[in-house]
Design a protein with these regions (language model features):
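Bacterial N-terminal signal peptides that target proteins for export
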Residues: 1-9
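Bacterial N-terminal signal peptides
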Residues: 8-19
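Carbohydrate-active catalytic/glycan-binding domains of CAZyme proteins
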Residues: 23-335
Length: 335
C-alpha cells in the first residue's frame, strides 16, 4: 500500500510539474547582435532617437521595413520588421516592394516616409521603354519608433498620377514639406521637387514645385540605354553659414554617385545650383545625414550599389560652403 501511495504521489508531482512547465511562457530569445560591416542593406536611414538615446537604422525588406538599433553605431541589434504592407494596403493595387524608408521624429510622433512600388500600369505606355506604373511616396505615423505604423490613406501621399520616390521631410519656418524625386521613367529627365504638407503630415497642402532636373548636374552621366537622367535620394541639411545643402544621388562615370546641390538663399525654394564635384564617387549613394548624440555630423550611404550593398558611415565637415567627408567611421577590430 505504501508503495502504491508513493507511486501515486510521484505521478501527481510529475503531472503538476508538467502543468507548471506548460503554463510557463517560453523565455524570449536573446536579441541578435551584428556589427556594422556585416549588415547587408541598401537605402538606409539612421534616426538618433533623443528620447531613448538609441540609433534606429531602417531599410527595405521586401514589402516591409527592417530596423536595427544601436547605442554606439558599431553593434546593432536586429533586424526586426516594424512595418509590413497588408495585401490590401492600396486597395486592389498589389504592393510589390517598399523602397527607401526614412524615419523622422516630428511633434511627438514617429513617421515613416516610404516608396511603394507596384506593377499597375498607367494608360500611357512608351515603346522600348520601362513600364510606367503606379509608384509613390507615402507617409505613415506611429507613437513609437517600433510602430505600429498606420497610413492616413490607401494611396500615395503625393499625386497618384505621378511616379514619385524617395520622399524626405524638411521643415522650414515651422512648415513641413516633402522633398521627393519625380522619376525619370515617367519624364526622362528626372527631377527633385517639393510640396507643402499638412501640419500632421497626413496629406499635401498645395501642388508640387520643381527644384531642379538631373541634367543640371555636370557630373551626372546620361543613361546610354534610355537617354535619361536619374535623380535619387534627396536629403537636406542647413549649414552653419545659413546655406541649405541637399545631397542626392545618380550615376556618373564611376558608378553610383552622391552629389550636392546648394541653395545660397538658405531657402527650400532656392534657387539651387549644383556643385561640379560630387562628394562621393565610389559607387555609393542614397545618402542621408544625422548628428550623433555627442555632436558629430555623419553621412550614411549604401555601397556598392548592388546585391552586396551595405551601410557605410562617414564623418562629415560642414565648411559653410559645402559638405566634405573627413573619414570613414569604422568599427574597432574585435579582440
Amino acid at each position: 500500500m505504501a508503495a502504491k501511495m508513493r507511486a501515486g504521489l510521484t505521478l501527481m508531482m510529475v503531472c503538476l510539474s508538467a502543468t507548471a512547465m506548460a503554463q510557463t511562457p517560453p523565455a524570449a530569445e536573446p536579441a541578435k547582435v551584428i556589427r556594422l560591416p556585416d549588415i547587408r542593406m541598401r537605402d538606409v536611414c539612421i534616426l538618433p532617437d533623443q528620447a531613448s538615446k538609441t540609433y534606429y537604422m531602417v531599410g527595405p525588406g521586401g514589402r516591409g521595413v527592417r530596423a536595427y538599433t544601436s547605442k554606439d553605431l558599431v553593434n546593432w541589434e536586429g533586424p526586426r520588421m516594424i512595418f509590413q504592407a497588408p495585401d490590401d494596403f492600396w486597395g486592389e493595387i498589389p504592393i510589390v516592394s517598399i523602397w527607401a524608408p526614412e524615419m523622422h521624429a516630428y511633434k511627438g510622433k514617429y513617421y515613416l516616409f516610404l516608396t511603394f512600388d507596384t506593377r499597375n500600369k498607367f494608360p500611357e505606355q512608351w515603346r522600348n521603354w520601362l513600364p510606367r506604373v503606379t509608384r509613390g511616396s507615402q507617409v505613415l505615423v506611429a507613437d513609437a519608433p517600433t510602430g505600429p505604423f498606420k497610413a492616413f490613406a490607401n494611396h500615395s501621399t503625393l499625386p497618384v498620377d505621378m511616379m514619385t520616390l524617395d520622399g524626405t521631410l524638411w521643415v522650414e519656418d515651422g512648415v513641413p514639406y516633402m522633398v521627393f524625386c519625380h522619376e525619370w521613367v515617367q519624364i526622362k529627365d528626372g527631377t527633385v521637387e517639393y510640396v507643402r504638407l499638412k501640419d500632421d503630415l497626413s496629406a499635401t497642402d498645395g501642388e508640387p514645385i520643381r527644384l531642379f532636373h538631373g541634367s543640371d548636374a555636370v557630373w551626372l552621366k546620361k543613361s546610354e540605354q534610355y537617354g535619361c537622367y536619374v535623380t535619387d535620394g534627396p536629403y537636406l541639411y542647413k549649414s552653419k553659414s545659413g546655406k541649405l545643402f541637399m545631397i542626392w544621388a545618380s550615376h556618373s562615370q564611376t558608378g553610383y554617385t552622391t552629389g550636392i546641390a546648394i541653395s545660397d538663399s538658405g531657402k527650400l525654394a532656392g534657387p539651387w545650383r549644383q556643385q561640379a564635384e560630387p562628394i562621393y564617387t565610389k559607387d555609393g549613394g542614397h545618402a542621408m545625414l544625422f548628428t550623433t548624440f555627442d555632436g558629430r555630423l555623419m553621412m550614411v550611404l549604401h555601397s556598392p550599389n548592388g546585391p552586396a550593398a551595405r551601410p557605410r558611415i562617414f564623418e562629415m565637415e560642414d565648411t559653410g560652403e559645402t559638405l566634405r567627408i573627413t573619414k570613414e567611421f569604422t568599427a574597432p577590430s574585435q579582440p
